[in-house]
Amino acid sequence: MEDIIKTLPQHTCSFLKHRFTLYKYKDAWNHQEFLEGRILSEQKFKAHPNDVFLASYPKSGTTWLKALAFAIITREKFDDSTSPLLTTMPHDCIPLLEKDLEKIQENQRNSLYTPISTHFHYKSLPESARTSNCKIVYIYRNMKDVIVSYYHFLRQIVKLSVEEAPFEEAFDEFCQGISSCGPYWEHIKGYWKASLEKPEIFLFLKYEDMKKDPVPSVKKLADFIGHPFTPKEEEAGVIEDIVKLCSFEKLSSLEVNKSGMHRPEEAHSIENRLYFRKGKDGDWKNYFTDEMTQKIDKLIDEKLGATGLVLK
């Protein structure tokens, strides 16, 4: 593994005072742990037709999507007062392909087909995942808010203040396509193109639409992943209960998400609270200059205009 990594193009992020390094492997940038997970999954992961992937670019609503999916598939065992989400961080409830291959394989052996989360580009997914007709849920978000959220997440991980980490430099790197799991537009475009060929196995969810009116999206998600709500459940308000349980306000207020650690056994563990910054859209307006806005709008039109996805 180390021999492969040594040969790859690399970039140390200037806005993070060179404390974070990305490696380019097959046209996508990743930090070392995700890169190792990608290579390992290419070699060892075998998809099952019952697998469901929850795919996203980082900071696009991943935590929320994982919480919703987990609450949906476990609602027969737990309600909103007994759910493991009350004591367990969402990222620890659903395995990540980049990091939890052994757990995923164990689940498959035991016929426990829980969703599998991933930040991989579509073409970076193991071949079996792309050829076995697994269902794929893809959540996407306004690119401007993604940049702001990504910036804060990384600078807090490496323990830099806003003053120490220039946002302008983060913005410029992102626009060059240099970001974790970037380029961002290639990430979205890859899943979108694949959905044109196999629309029946893809569900696209827009973060902003979900925030505005979550119930229809949650119902659509449950139908798609094979756990539809019954008319009786809908009448009883089960969907609304799940929406409340998985809301930013609820999850961010839980002790586990205020003081716990994600993957505490690892050298690069992350504070759970860093996954819960604001949970709203439009925060980019507090950071972007008019020039930045014009630049990013032009970039979105050039790179993603053909998709028809609204990312501004």
Swiss-Prot record:
The active site is at H119 (proton acceptor). The N-terminus is blocked. No requirement for divalent cations and insensitive to p-chloromercuribenzoate, iodoacetate, or iodoacetamide. The keyword Transferase applies. PANTHER family: SULFOTRANSFERASE SULT. Belongs to the sulfotransferase 1 family. This is Flavonol 3-sulfotransferase. The lineage of its organism: Eukaryota, Viridiplantae, Streptophyta, Embryophyta, Tracheophyta.
